[in-house]
Amino acid sequence: MTPTLRRKLEALAERREELQHLLSDPDVVNNNDKFRTLSRELSQLEPVAVALEDEARAKADLSAAEAMRTDPEMRELAEEEIAAAQARLEELDTQLASLLVPRDPRDDGNLFLEVRAGTGGDEAAIFAGDLFRMYARYAERQGWKVEIESDSPGEHGGYKEVVARVVGRGAYSRLKFESGTHRVQRVPATESQGRIHTSAATVAIIPEADDVEEIVINPADLKVDTFRSSGAGGQHVNKTESAIRITHVPSGVVVECQTERSQHANRDKAMKRLKAQLLDTEHSKAAAAQAQTRKLQVGSGDRSQRIRTYSFPQGRITDHRVEGLTLYDLPNIIEGDLDALIARLLHEHQADELARLSDSP
């Protein structure tokens, strides 16, 4: 571990001691909001404290074993204990470094998943449907809930566009690196000559805005349209203009919702998505600026970036943001088995963040 990272760990340990003193202050105890905020911060620092205590014990074990090595009768046992202590210290070094990576406060929250067909006509819509099902099945494995907010089916299957809300603890932390252009290479069912076609779909992962996050939306900047829904709700949806489309004129962002029976409920859902999109745009600009400065790929927030190719003839998936990230497990991945892929992306992002921390004073 670099001296810079070690100093940051020491600062966190000092902050933990400071928080413990603050939380015993009667003024803080009697202030519910402040007590809750400081308690949350302290709980986030506990894993660092535990790892530092484990590291101190491992260093003491190593010193004791090295001292024991001078005794010829104990040398063999000492060598074993030295090896075990060194292995434990290496493990703790990695663990402590990972604990330094700043936690995205949005990680535990829900998200909006948007999948749109790109170039490739009917095959692009079918691929967009495949991607949506892949994420829906992954969500099901995690015990998350998927609620379709709006969709536009393709003429021969799949979706021209589908928007869903994914509800579950940690959903955003697992799927936030999926935004971008996804490309597929395969022989379409309608292709009589057996030729491989290439088509694409875009994915956007937008964290649901927390109620604490403030963003001012001027009602005068909104254009609100109503239309007859084609979604859930039985015959009622086709008789009344309950569906809502909201355009934020300054940014050009358009959201719509047609899944609820009442216009009021659809408007509430649409406004939540609009708020989430506008906040995400701000976060994405900051992430893109940082990525440009450090030449990062994972987590750059660029949705126009081609991030992945799905080659069905070869049964492989290649993620273009991480050198050497090719998995020959396409059949399982497209069925929602994303754990190995997501783990590699999270590891790469963590490495980028640690490099940034090492460079900072």
UniProtKB/Swiss-Prot annotation:
Q: Which UniProt keywords apply?
A: Cytoplasm, Methylation, Protein biosynthesis
Q: What is its main location?
A: cytoplasm
N5-methylglutamine PTM positions read: Q235
UniProt keyword annotation of Cytoplasm present = yes
UniProt's post-translational modification comment states: Methylated by PrmC. Methylation increases the termination efficiency of RF1.
Q: Which InterPro entries match?
A: PCRF, Pep_chain_release_fac_I, Pep_chain_release_fac_I_sf, Prokaryotic/Mito_RF, RF-1
Record carries keyword Secreted: no
Compartments, as annotated in UniProt: Cytoplasm
Which PROSITE patterns is this protein grouped with? RF_PROK_I (PS00745)
Q: Which residues form a coiled coil?
A: none
A single GO CC term, please?
Answer: cytoplasm
**From the UniProt record, which GO molecular function terms apply?**
translation release factor activity, codon specific
Query: What HAMAP family does the database record attribute to this sequence?
Result: Rel_fac_1
Read off the NCBIfam families from this record: prfA, PRK00591.1
To which protein family does this belong?
Belongs to the prokaryotic/mitochondrial release factor family.
Q: What does this protein do?
A: Peptide chain release factor 1 directs the termination of translation in response to the peptide chain termination codons UAG and UAA.
What name is this protein filed under?
Answer: Peptide chain release factor 1
Source taxonomy = Bacteria, Pseudomonadati, Pseudomonadota, Gammaproteobacteria, Lysobacterales
